């Protein structure tokens, strides 16, 4: 079995969130804390479903993981809301992960709800996955803790018994080298060299708001190599930096493994472009790629890291500056080489220079040597016009802010020969064989070979014609465009203006333009794909300002897909040509995106192949013609008086005068020749200076155009965001007005329904009150009538009582009379009882009728209430379905409660009547059994029959109302009583 790796990674994958509120002006960030180390995700937009898509990881071994699991160490995730404007940080909530749930197998992510959620109305959740992964890679920077050294360094240091943090470079002044690692084990000699070869586009590092401290400032590159401060030769021209490539090297005693750990700890070399004590820009060269794990290249040949590195201004991050285009980015060519001492090397590094024209005067080709410096101390051993930073001050860094401002980069200095060529050219930097001493400065005699790298291109654009005008008025138009990638930001315009009318095609004069430039093919393709050519249509009017009508967008990448044709160049080399023709619409610049007219164009791209060998030229124009410095010859001696008299023209005096005049004329000619030569030299110098100033102005204009383009892009973006926000605000206001109207209508409708309900309830109450009043009045009348009958019966009873007493007194002694009187009395009582029974029967029938009417009225009210409820339900069916259901339920519940109460009242009344009937029936039985002396069985049977008849009548009466059926409780009770009476009757 393969043993498990001891090195693990605790990986927390934070994928996405949901149920978050939308806060457009805030950002969301999640911070994870474990074992004292804190990691965080990148800020994302504060939307309802934020996308984090971030993995956070901690290095750990199995033993420490086991201890953390025993101690139940949690992983706490905190979610914050950031305000970019005020940098305010609000806590949204937190999540606690249990480390014991982490497994080495891949697990599906889970949703975790935020605890102590700030947004109480939203149940915000985050999708998180917690896993363990085997740490197999040598160095994974994204998984390291912030201050953790590479893992290879840990392993090697543990083998050597040395802490990686204790590995430092110590200067050995006697031996002239730096010792890295223990001296008894690290004895291999190495040479580490840094070469600064070229620099381009340095003027981009100085914005228009910066001012340099001097009128003629001197610039230099500064870096620290093993504690040694190194600066190169200063130069004063940022646009055309002219300095010799210099190599600074140090000798090292170490071993490959210890040196790899040291380079991993000090993995970056910072190079600053300085002016005085200010850092204008810097770049970082990675050193950890020199010695790779398991590589033995250092034993065969030197290992190098070289290339053109982009310089970044120190305040780009603070000011949030926009990125500079690739063709305008400031770069510095640097080569870092590491070799064993005694091995020769040659490294290639690209030299990029600006395009230019050849000088008119004769030039002499010389190869520029590379100056080499050997560093043995903490300071640079050479002297330079620009003093290096003092030992007690730190070197300029990215954070050093400059306090000055610049209007333009114009320097008044002596003319120097400039290096001109086409394209980018690499140079070979060779290193001398012999190693210098402890403090020597040696000039290498090897040369810079410049192999070709870029292609020479010629791009031409022919704006042929415009046609199909859509405007109602004629246009006096010119076309204008610019494309800084071709080497010039100056606009190209057609001239003179041409008049275009409807239904006509007009050919444009002076519309052909060709551009010669050098670049890499992939850079050309990338630029053509990203940046289209924008052609502006302007209307020229003599009475007013020029008016921008529209813009045509020409996609230059179309020519890359066209067919290639082969042709021979001027020197017989093989070249390629691509041609593309098309018509594009010109879209209105303002208002709606309507087409104004169509533009027909033809573009051609010619590839002349790789650029030729470029060498550095040194002008010979400084070798002036030497001035003629002749002294006039002494006049001839006077002739002796003894000589013979001669002709006047033959005399010595005449000849001397003639020679003197001829000498004067010759001197005048020589002086005029010298003046002409000096004038020519001054004119050439003036022309060179003028060209130089023109290039500087063009570069500054290009830079300002790029800055203004960036500002214009920001302004356009801000305007677009503002328009979007205005549209969102307008739509939100419209939605608010609509919702307000709907709420107002809903409120009015609900108020009207409430008023209708109140009115109906009031009418129902009034009707019920009137009905109760009528019932009360009728009951009062019945009461008075019954009271009158009771009084009459009482009076009649008293009269009969008196008569009976008198008759009784008279018939006390007569049995027949007494019996007769008793019979009569009983007969009267019988009649009275029959009358009472009839009255009670009538009262019962009347009560049954009243009860039936009440039940019918109840059924009618119930039916009417149901009909009104159905009408309301139909009216509110679409909007208030749930309210209708609740209302119906409450209504039915109230109706059932009312019916139950009425049934309870009816049941109580029935019980009362039943009790009354039973009492009457009992009285009748007692009267019949006691006074008449009739048989007990016949009376009981008649009572049961009457009771049975009464029960059957009550049941039938209730069934006829239509309110009750056989399943109701009262009907079931009546049926039960009827069965009991029938049973008793059959038994008797």
UniProtKB/Swiss-Prot annotation:
Domain C2 spans what residues?
A: 1-112, 435-569
Question: Does Cytoplasm count among this protein's keywords?
Answer: yes
Its principal location? cytoplasm
List every stretch annotated Disordered. Answer: 354-425, 624-644
Any one GO cellular component localisation term in the record: centrosome
The alphabetical list of record keywords is:
Coiled coil, Cytoplasm, Cytoskeleton, Phosphoprotein, Repeat
Write down the InterPro entries for this protein, in alphabetical order: C2_dom (IPR000008), C2_domain_sf (IPR035892), CEP120-like (IPR039893), DUF3668 (IPR022136)
Q: Where in the cell is it found?
A: Cytoplasm, Cytoskeleton, Microtubule organizing center, Centrosome
Compositionally biased, Pro residues: which spans? 384-394
Family under the similarity heading: Belongs to the CEP120 family.
Give the protein name, as stated in the record. Centrosomal protein of 120 kDa
Q: Which organism is it from?
A: Mus musculus
């Amino acid at each position: 079995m393969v043993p498990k790796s001891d090195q693990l990674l605790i990986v927390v994958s934070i994928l996405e969130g949901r149920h978050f509120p939308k806060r457009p002006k805030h950002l969301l960030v999640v911070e994870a804390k474990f074992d004292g180390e804190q990691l965080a995700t990148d800020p994302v937009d504060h939307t309802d479903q934020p996308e984090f898509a971030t993995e956070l990881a901690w290095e750990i071994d199995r033993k420490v993981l086991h201890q953390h699991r025993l101690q139940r160490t949690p992983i706490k995730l905190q979610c914050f809301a950031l305000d970019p404007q005020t940098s305010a940080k609000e806590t949204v909530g937190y999540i606690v992960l249990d480390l014991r749930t982490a497994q080495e197998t891949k697990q599906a992510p889970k949703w975790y709800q935020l605890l102590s959620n700030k947004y109480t109305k939203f149940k915000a959740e985050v999708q998180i996955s917690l896993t363990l992964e085997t740490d197999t890679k040598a160095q994974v920077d994204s998984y390291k803790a912030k201050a953790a050294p590479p893992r290879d360094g840990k392993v090697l240091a543990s083998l050597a018994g040395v802490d990686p943090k204790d590995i430092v470079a110590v200067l050995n002044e006697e031996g002239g080298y730096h010792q890295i690692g223990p001296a008894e084990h690290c004895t291999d000699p190495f040479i580490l060299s840094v070469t600064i070869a070229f620099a381009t586009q340095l003027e981009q590092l100085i914005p228009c708001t910066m001012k340099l401290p001097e009128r003629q400032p001197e610039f230099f590159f500064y870096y620290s190599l093993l504690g040694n401060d190194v600066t190169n030769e200063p130069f004063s021209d940022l646009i055309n930096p002219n300095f010799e490539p210099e190599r600074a090297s140090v000798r090292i005693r170490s071993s490959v493994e210890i040196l790899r750990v040291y380079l991993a700890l000090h993995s970056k070399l910072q190079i600053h472009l300085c002016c005085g004590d200010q850092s204008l820009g810097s770049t970082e060269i990675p050193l950890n790629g020199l010695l790779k794990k398991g590589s033995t290249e250092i034993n065969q040949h030197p290992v190098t890291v070289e290339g053109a590195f982009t310089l970044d201004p120190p305040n780009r991050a603070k000011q949030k500056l926009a990125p500079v285009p690739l063709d305008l980015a400031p770069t510095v060519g640097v080569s870092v080489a590491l070799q064993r001492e005694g091995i020769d090397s040659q490294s290639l590094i690209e030299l990029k220079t600006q395009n230019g024209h050849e000088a008119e005067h004769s030039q002499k080709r010389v190869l520029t040597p590379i100056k080499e410096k050997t560093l043995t101390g903490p300071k640079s051993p050479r002297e330079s016009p620009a003093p290096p930073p003092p030992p007690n001050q730190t070197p300029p860094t990215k954070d050093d802010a400059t306090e000055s401002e610049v209007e333009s980069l114009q320097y008044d200095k002596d003319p120097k020969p400039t290096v001109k060529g086409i394209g980018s050219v690499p140079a070979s930097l060779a290193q001398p064989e012999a190693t210098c001493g402890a403090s020597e400065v040696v000039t290498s005699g090897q040369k810079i070979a410049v192999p070709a790298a870029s292609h020479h291109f010629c791009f031409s654009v022919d704006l042929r014609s415009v046609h199909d005008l859509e405007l109602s008025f004629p246009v006096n138009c010119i076309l204008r465009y610019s494309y800084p990638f071709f080497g010039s930001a100056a606009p190209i315009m057609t001239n003179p203006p041409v008049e275009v009318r409807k239904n006509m095609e007009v050919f444009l004069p002076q519309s052909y333009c060709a551009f010669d430039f050098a670049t890499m093919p992939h850079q050309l393709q990338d630029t053509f794909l990203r940046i289209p050519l924008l052609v502006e249509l302007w209307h020229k009017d003599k009475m007013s300002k020029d008016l921008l009508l529209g813009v045509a967008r020409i996609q230059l990448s179309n020519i890359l897909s066209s067919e290639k044709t082969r042709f021979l160049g001027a020197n017989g080399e093989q070249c390629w040509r691509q041609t593309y023709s098309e018509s594009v619409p010109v879209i209105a610049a303002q208002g709606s995106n309507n087409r104004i007219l169509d533009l027909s164009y033809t573009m051609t791209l010619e590839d002349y192949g790789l650029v030729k060998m470029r060498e550095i030229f040194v002008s010979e124009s400084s070798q002036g013609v030497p001035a003629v410095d002749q002294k006039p010859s002494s006049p001839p001696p006077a002739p002796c008086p003894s000589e013979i008299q001669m002709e006047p023209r033959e005399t010595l005096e005449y000849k001397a005068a003639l020679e003197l005049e001829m000498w004067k004329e010759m001197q005048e000619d020589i002086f005029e020749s010298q003046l002409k030569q000096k004038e020519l030299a001054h004119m050439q110098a003036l022309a060179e200076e003028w060209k130089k100033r023109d290039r500087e102005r063009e570069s500054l204009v290009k830079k300002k155009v790029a800055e203004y383009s960036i500002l214009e892009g920001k302004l356009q973006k801000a305007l677009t965001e503002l328009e979007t926000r205005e549209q969102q605000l307008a739509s939100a206001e419209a939605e608010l007005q609509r919702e307000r109207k709907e709420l107002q209508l809903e409120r009015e409708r609900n108020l009207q329904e409430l008023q209708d309900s109140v009115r109906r309830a009031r009418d129902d109450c009034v009707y019920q009150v009137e009905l109760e009043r009528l019932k009360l009045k009728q009951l009062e009348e019945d009461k008075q009538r019954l009271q009158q009958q009771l009084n009459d019966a009482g009076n009649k009873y008293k009269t009969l009582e008196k008569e009976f007493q008198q008759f009784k007194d008279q018939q006390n002694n007569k049995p027949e009379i007494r019996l007769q009187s008793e019979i009569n009395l009983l007969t009267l009582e019988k009649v009275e009882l029959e009358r009472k029974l009839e009255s009670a029967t009538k009262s019962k029938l009347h009560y049954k009728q009243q009860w039936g009417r009440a039940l019918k009225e109840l059924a009618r009210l119930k039916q009417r209430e149901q009909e009104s409820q159905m009408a309301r339900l139909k009216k509110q069916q679409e909007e208030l379905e749930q309210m209708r259901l609740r209302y119906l339920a409450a209504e039915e519940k109230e109706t059932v409660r009312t019916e139950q109460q009425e049934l309870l009242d009816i049941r109580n009344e029935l019980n009362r009547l039943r009790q009354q009937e039973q009492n009457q029936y009992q009285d009748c039985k007692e009267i019949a059994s006691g006074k008449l002396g009739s048989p007990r069985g016949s009376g009981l049977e008649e009572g049961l029959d009457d009771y049975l008849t009464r029960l059957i009548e009550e049941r039938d009466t209730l069934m006829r109302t239509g309110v009750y059926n056989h399943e109701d409780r009262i009907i079931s009770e009546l049926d039960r009583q009827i069965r009991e009476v029938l049973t008793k009757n059959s038994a008797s």
